[in-house]
Amino acid sequence: MTSSHTTGASARQELTPILKWVGGKRQLLDFIRPLIPEHTTYCEPFVGGGAGFFDLQPKKAVINDFNQELINVYQTVKEQPEELIELLLRHREQNSQEYFYQIRALDREPEKYEELTPAQRAARIIYLNKTCYNGLFRVNSAGQFNAPWGRYKNPNIVSEDNIRAMSRYLNKSKTTIRCGDYREALKGLRKGAFVYLDPPYMPLSSSSSFTGYTASGFGQAEQIELKRQCDLLNKKGIKFLLSNSCCDFIEDLYSGYQIERVPAKRAINARADRRGAIDEVLVRNF
């Protein structure tokens, strides 16, 4: 079997996620990395900030997310890295509280927002993500970015080397970038593929649920449907690894599979007192 495990040591350059993302997996990489089996295609249907994907750098991959703005960022990095860098440098020059709210308000006027080019939209999201409070990408029920100004003295708005390296990798690898329902990304996968699933987590309390990345939520019914999709992958002989909250509901739901509890530090939370170490689970069928 041909392995799509990595791009190869000679071509490999370390890549850092371009966006800060709630539930980002950088804290869990040391646990996830040794578990990833040999595979022909790597699939990540809830790619988010892509910490695992960019760490692994598979030769052949399918990445997907429901968030259109996020996927537009990856498409722009792949296709227009220099234009993106130029726009981010302009944002950096003008960065201030007043400017932040001016850029944030662009999506309040749909007609004007639709006039933005994909590169302008991508630069806007990266700029807001780097300068908003605690790095929260959050939208309201109308789909408008609503995280407040972060008051950072010297935010890292643009990393030119990282954007260029990420663009080179996305163009060199056989990576399909999709936007839509995660189930569509799973269709057509064959035995030999490997799927890493990092869905919106099951909330541990009524106040801890964070589904602000898209205006639609991901509740108990969606978690049950996700388990059904995992069962379908298992029947096809496709290996999967899933991360989720460490709670009775998830452990009972996946009781037929291998479950490992791992400690994870949550750096991003709207409430400072909720940040810190908390157990999560890694579920796998191999």
Regions found by a protein language model. Name each.
Residues T2-Q27, L35, Q80-Y196, P200-T211, ...:
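SAM-dependent nucleic-acid methyltransferase catalytic core
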Residues F46-A51, I163, N244-D248:
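Short, polar loop motifs at secondary-structure junctions
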Residues G192-L282:
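Conserved acidic-Pro-Pro-aromatic motif
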